[in-house]
Structures are given as C-alpha cells and as structure tokens.
Amino acid sequence: MNNNPVVVLGCGLVGSAIVKDFALVENRHVVAVDISRENLDALPESDRITVRLEDVSQPGKVAELVADAALVICAVPGFMGYETLRKIIEAGKDHMMAFEPSEF
C-alpha cells in the first residue's frame, strides 16, 4: 500500500472502529468522512486522523473525497451503500465494503 490515506466513508458504529484501527498503523493516515459532526467529534484526536464533515450523497463528492486515497472503505448506512460503492468503483479506487444492505 502506498503512503496515500485510507478514506473511510461513514463513521458510525462500524466506520469509527475502522478509523481507530487504521490510525494505529504506523505511517498510515486516515481520512474520516461523515455527515454527522457528532460522529466525527467522537473519534479520538490523533495526528493520523483527518475528519471531513461531508455529505457523500452530493453529486461529485465521492470522487472528490477519494481522489488521492490508497484504499476506500465504504461504511455508510445500508440504504446508501450500493450507490456509494458504485461511485467508488467508477473512481477506480481499491475498496472494501463495511455496510449491510438495509432491505432485510
């Protein structure tokens, strides 16, 4: 993996745990993205974590946020998951899913 950041889209219960884990990796920077200020404020303060208060449902926002990412983790709520994942794939980024479809 290169030195570009890991971008975590969605910092609720699952995404925040992922951010915390990646922040423990030496020489790894994490960009934590969420629409909720409360979720972002709950993350630990670290020079390895950058928080971004953003709405990934806005046109072009996902492509902008993941442009320099080494890896993108999609941890948005299930109802947003597939559409957000499609945008990550269209951006040509390595990625992983950390959401469950909300249709269940």
Region annotations inferred by a language model:
Residues 99-104:
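Rossmann-fold NAD(P)-binding glycine/threonine-rich loop
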Residues 54-68:
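Conserved Rossmann-fold cofactor-binding substructure of NAD(P)-dependent oxidoreductases
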Residues 6-10:
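Conserved N-terminal Rossmann-fold NAD(P)-binding element of oxidoreductases
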Residues 15-16:
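N-terminal Rossmann-fold NAD(P) dinucleotide-binding loop
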Residues 39, 58-62, 80-84:
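Short acidic active-site motifs
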Residues 27-44:
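NAD(P)-binding Rossmann-fold cofactor-contacting core
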Residues 66, 70-75, 95-97:
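N-terminal Rossmann-like NAD(P) cofactor-binding module of classical short-chain dehydrogenase/reductase
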Residues 22-23:
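Aromatic pocket-lining residues of Rossmann-like dinucleotide-binding sites
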